[in-house]
Amino acid sequence: MSRLLVPLVCAAALAACDSDSDREVALRFAPVVGDQPFACGEDFDGIGSGASTVTPLDFRMYVHEVALLRSSGERVPVAIRDDGQWQSEGLVLLDFEDGSGACMTGSPATNFEVRGNVPDHGDYVGVEFIVGVPHEQNHLDGAIAPAPLNAQGMWWTWQGGYKYVRLDMRPSTQSEFFYHLGATNCDGSVQDGFECAYANLPSVRIDGFDPGRDTIVVDAAKILAGVDVDHVPDGVKDTLPGCMAFPGDPECPAMMAPLGLRFEDNAPAGVQTVFSARARGGE
């Protein structure tokens, strides 16, 4: 090879190594209830502080601001691909229920992935995302909003916004036990805009995550761990089974803490425990 060509070849090789060309990425979420895969039509034992048996009714959530973390600490946003159904403008609806069994509020369609593009680096070691809907999208009119904001059952009428997380279960003592998370203490209108005292947007960071090999586990049992799902409300101090973030709701502190939130307080509550990483071979 000519001596003149050697530097050019080396320079080309170095440029290829430093290339910022994109690659497709699919971040897989695996919903579980304790050590069992989440599934409509199944019963799950040992749930909550009373070790109760529950049947799933619904399990969905929105996520946004998804990013991968490099070994250097650099945060690399995932360019979410709009698909007209689950993903739009950086917002993704994860839908774990399939409309079977007791999951009658949903539909057969499901979505377990966040799909997009990232620079083709080889040193991604973590993932970050925010659970919920950004403020600027949260108070659109759910009746005419585009997908995925038009999902049936995810519009939170009493707050004029969306349910960031919807986890509904049926215990043995009552027909439903709810967990509906969203922005609360909101004033305003869809036309004029809203201001909310509590954003309730959990920020999640998972270290030791390889997007090519690992799955993001979402454990519903962690959300329910600190409450007795068989407890029947007295209609006075506790008006609804579960947590819908009503002012003074007694179940909410224990159900929001696993997502790193404090009830009726914007200060963080600590490290979230609902999301973790697992090798895909362990699914």
Residue positions per predicted region:
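Bacterial N-terminal signal peptides that target proteins for export
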Residues: 1-6
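C-terminal motif of bacterial Sec signal peptides marking the signal peptidase cleavage site
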Residues: 13-16
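A short, solvent-exposed, low-complexity linear motif enriched for acidic/polar residues
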Residues: 19-283
